[in-house]
């Protein structure tokens, strides 16, 4: 079973590598960085493993420790249980620690190592103790981060030449992203705390660096004296209007270039008038030919029966199943109501797991 699932994983990895290799030139022609392809491949693999369709069964062990031999003697069995209880009590006493007023509280957290961690670090399936020091008086601060703030930092790092990973370029341009804008306290204000305004902008504005051009110093200074709710509303309306105007200008610029730079409408009209005179006779001949062809096609077509109708209910019943096999038929044999199938080169999904095979046989009766 593990060998079959390993083969499935190899097939999926081969497909991923083939797709990434074939689209690499197209991405490079569009100016997309090579790192984006590598991230796409890694995300694809992570989603494949997260689906658990090709989850590998863990190794049973390295074989260095033989399985324990359990005797049928009840006395020896009781003695073994007593030794196990003593060992557990000793472990509990060792791990116990006193907690004082100014002391730190330590906890042992058992993390179950995955198959990948076990293979890399040499630790088989077990509990890995990790000690965490947490001060009872000064807990560690939490730093919440949002997707928009992360994208802003990455975009700033990319503009300053730090060589960050262009994750913003991989987003859908029409996706709406929240962006947090921090306003300093206005001059002469009693409170020195800064305010955070949240606006919604499409990802295309972040990809094309339009937001930094819209948020000018004059705009920020004009809304600093407004309340937080009103300032957010005014800023959102200004950004929406600016983005709409920019998109409208792009549409007009693209429409102007459709006919070409040196095109003349007068010449087109004169040529069209001459062409209309010459093509009147040709249109009449084409209409006659089309009518004759339609009559011939109508005579050859057979009338449809009710059995030929395709309804949505049939397709829903066909694919409403938990187990699916996609393969090629080698041959089919039948003896009365017993059928035998010989399949080849297929993949099947059984109970949420994927399996590949070169040859397979199946029996059915109906």
Swiss-Prot record:
GO terms for molecular function: TBP-class protein binding; TFIID-class transcription factor complex binding. Residues 56-82, 133-162, 257-317 are annotated as: Disordered. This is Transcription initiation factor IIA subunit 1. The keyword Phosphoprotein applies. Residues 264-317 have a biased composition (Acidic residues). TFIIA is a component of the transcription machinery of RNA polymerase II and plays an important role in transcriptional activation. TFIIA in a complex with TBP mediates transcriptional activity. SUPFAM superfamilies: Transcription factor IIA (TFIIA), alpha-helical domain, Transcription factor IIA (TFIIA), beta-barrel domain. It comes from the Eukaryota. The lineage of its organism: Eukaryota, Metazoa, Ecdysozoa, Arthropoda, Hexapoda. The modification Phosphoserine is found at residues 265, 306. InterPro entries: TFIIA_asu/bsu (IPR004855), TFIIA_b-brl (IPR009088). Keywords: Nucleus, Phosphoprotein, Transcription, Transcription regulation. Disulfide bonds: none annotated. Its main location: nucleus. The precursor form (48 kDa) is cleaved to give rise to the alpha (30 kDa) and beta (20 kDa) subunits. It holds the Pfam family TFIIA. SMART domains: TFIIA. It is found in: Nucleus. GO terms for cellular component: nucleus; transcription factor TFIIA complex. Residues 146-162 have a biased composition (Low complexity). Belongs to the TFIID complex which is composed of TATA binding protein (Tbp) and a number of TBP-associated factors (Tafs). TFIIA is a heterodimer of a unprocessed large subunit 1 and a small subunit gamma. It was originally believed to be a heterotrimer of an alpha (p30), a beta (p20) and a gamma subunit (p14). Interacts with Tbp. Taf4 interacts with TFIIA-L when TFIIA-L is in complex with Tbp. GO terms for biological process: transcription by RNA polymerase II; transcription initiation at RNA polymerase II promoter. Belongs to the TFIIA subunit 1 family.
